[in-house]
Amino acid sequence: MASGDTKTSVKHAHLCAERLSVREEEGDAEDYCTPGAFELERLFWKGSPQYTHVNEVWPRLHIGDEATALDRYGLQKAGFTHVLNAAHGRWNVDTGPDYYRDMAIEYHGVEADDVPTFDLSIFFYSAAAFIDSALRDDHSKILVHCAMGRSRSATLVLAYLMIHKNMTLVDAIQQVAKNRCVLPNRGFLKQLRELDKQLVKQRRQAGPGDSDLGL
């Protein structure tokens, strides 16, 4: 049973990869299907090896680590106006509104654990809305961080790009991975795949008129 499931999964992954190639060549979004976890992980592996404390992955949108979030002077000097902490909480990166109270920084916390069984998807839309609201102001600059800036924070940024920038999961991964070495855990990747399927279905039903389903 397990062997058969593996073969089916690999076959599906190769089929999706072939369809992705066709879509890239012909520009036909109707041929897109959500790739399997292995194919998606390969996209991350092909990305940038760059892994510093913080990297800009989209205009004025940065993914960073705990050290970046704790450096109040550095945040102020860099001009950050918003912070989304994907590892909020006493036993994670324990900052919060009070930590930035004397700074011109708007804070949003997501109390999440970096384990495959944690349901981060319940925060996808609220986190994406916070990022989108911040970036609507041309003078804003947002840091999305967790402990290492690789899994939780990257997952929320990917969800934002999918929800508000009309990207497929593949597009979003390629955008982020070319600027920072990230890799969501398998559980988060599964949740992003489900979001991708939902958004693709909704957009096909809505037609070309509605581009931003996050609103």
Curated annotation (Swiss-Prot):
Entry's localization field: Cytoplasm; Nucleus
Gene induction: Deletion of the long non-coding RNA (lncRNA) H19 leads to a decreased DUSP29 expression in muscle (at protein level). Down-regulated in muscle of high-fat diets-induced glucose-intolerant mice. Induced during neurogenic skeletal muscle atrophy.
GO terms for cellular component: cytoplasm; nucleus; protein-containing complex
SUPFAM superfamilies cross-referenced by the UniProt entry: (Phosphotyrosine protein) phosphatases II
Gene Ontology MF terms in the entry: MAP kinase phosphatase activity; protein homodimerization activity; protein serine/threonine phosphatase activity; protein tyrosine phosphatase activity; protein tyrosine/serine/threonine phosphatase activity
Enzyme Commission code: 3.1.3.16, 3.1.3.48
Primary site of residence: cytoplasm
Binding site residues for substrate: 145-152
Family matches, as Gene3D superfamilies: Protein tyrosine phosphatase superfamily
PROSITE patterns: TYR_PHOSPHATASE_1, TYR_PHOSPHATASE_2, TYR_PHOSPHATASE_DUAL
Expression across tissues: Skeletal muscle, liver and adipose tissue.
Active site feature: 146 (phosphocysteine intermediate)
Limits of the Tyrosine-protein phosphatase domain: 53-201
Keyword match Cytoplasm: yes
Any single GO BP term: glucose homeostasis
InterPro entries: Atypical_DUSP_subfamA, Dual-sp_phosphatase_cat-dom, Prot-tyrosine_phosphatase-like, Tyr_Pase_AS, Tyr_Pase_dom, TYR_PHOSPHATASE_DUAL_dom
Keyword Cytoplasm: yes
Catalytic activity: O-phospho-L-tyrosyl-[protein] + H2O = L-tyrosyl-[protein] + phosphate; O-phospho-L-seryl-[protein] + H2O = L-seryl-[protein] + phosphate; O-phospho-L-threonyl-[protein] + H2O = L-threonyl-[protein] + phosphate
PANTHER family given in the database record: AGAP008228-PA, DUAL SPECIFICITY PHOSPHATASE 29
Functional summary from the UniProt entry: Dual specificity phosphatase able to dephosphorylate phosphotyrosine, phosphoserine and phosphothreonine residues within the same substrate, with a preference for phosphotyrosine as a substrate. Involved in the modulation of intracellular signaling cascades. In skeletal muscle regulates systemic glucose homeostasis by activating, AMPK, an energy sensor protein kinase. Affects MAP kinase signaling though modulation of the MAPK1/2 cascade in skeletal muscle promoting muscle cell differentiation, development and atrophy.
Family of the protein in this entry: Belongs to the protein-tyrosine phosphatase family. Non-receptor class dual specificity subfamily.
Summary of subunit composition and partner proteins: Homodimer. Interacts with PRKAA2.
Name under which the protein is recorded: Dual specificity phosphatase 29
